[in-house]
Amino acid sequence: MLRNMVQTARKYKKVILVSTMIIGIIVLSFIAILLRFTVVTDYAAHHLFKDPERSIPVGNVIVSPADGTILYVKKIENGVIPEVVKKNVSIPITDHLKTTPLRPFENGYLIGIYMSTYGVHITRIPISGTIEKQIIFNGPHMNMTDAEIRIILTQMIPGMVTLRKIFGLMPYDIEDVADYILKSARETTVIADTRGKYVYVVRIADYYVGKLLTWIKEGSKVQTGLKYGYITWGSQVDIFFETSPGIDIRVTEGDVVYGGETILATY
C-alpha cells in the first residue's frame, strides 16, 4: 500500500511539475507580449498621436491643412495641372480630385504636402467657410515608403532641393515612385470659403493607412485651423484653391509647413 502511495505521489508530482512549467511558459509569454504591446503603445503615444498647440493666424489667409514638406506648388490654368507625377505631363484637375469640381475650376493653385511618418498627423481646415461636399474615392492604398525615403535623403543634403530646382529638376527625385498621387484612395473635402470660392482638400491614403478619420460633415461651419481629421502613419495632403484678385503664394517647394499655422497664401 505504501508503495502504491509513493508511486501515486510521484505520478502527480510529475503532472504538477509539467503543469507548472506550462503555466510558467504561458505567464512569461503573456508578460513578453504585454511588454511588447507597451512598447508599441508607448511609441504610438509619442510618435503617432502628436497634437501640439498651434498659433492660428488671422486675416485673409489660407493655412496649411497638414504638417509636412511642400512637394510641389503648381499654377492651374484652364482646369489643367501642368505636371504632378511625370515631368512635363499635364493632367486635368479631375484626375486628381477623382470628382468633378462643383463648378468649372479654371485658374488657381495646387500645393502638395508630404506628411512624415514621425510627424503630426492631425489635419486642419485651411480657411473659414462651409463644408459643401465630401467625396471618398475607394482606390488602392498604395505604398509611399520609397517616396518618403527619397525625400528624407534629399533633405539630409543641405541645398539639394534648391540645386535641383536651379537645374530644372523636380525638387525630389520621386517621379518613378509617385503614382500614388493620382491612383491611391483619397478623401476630397470641398470648402466654400469667405471669398465665395471653393477650396478642395485632398487627403491621400498610404498603404499603411487603414482609414482616413473625419470629424466634420457636409453643411458644417468651420474656422481656419480647426482640427477636422486624422491620418494614421502620415501620408499626403494636397490643396486646390481658386485664384482671386491679390492672391499671393507664400511657400515654395521644399519648405517645411505646420498644419493650421503656416500661411500658404494671402488674398
Question: Which residues does each predicted region cover?
Answer:
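Contiguous, well-folded functional domains in the mature portion of proteins
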Residues: 1-267
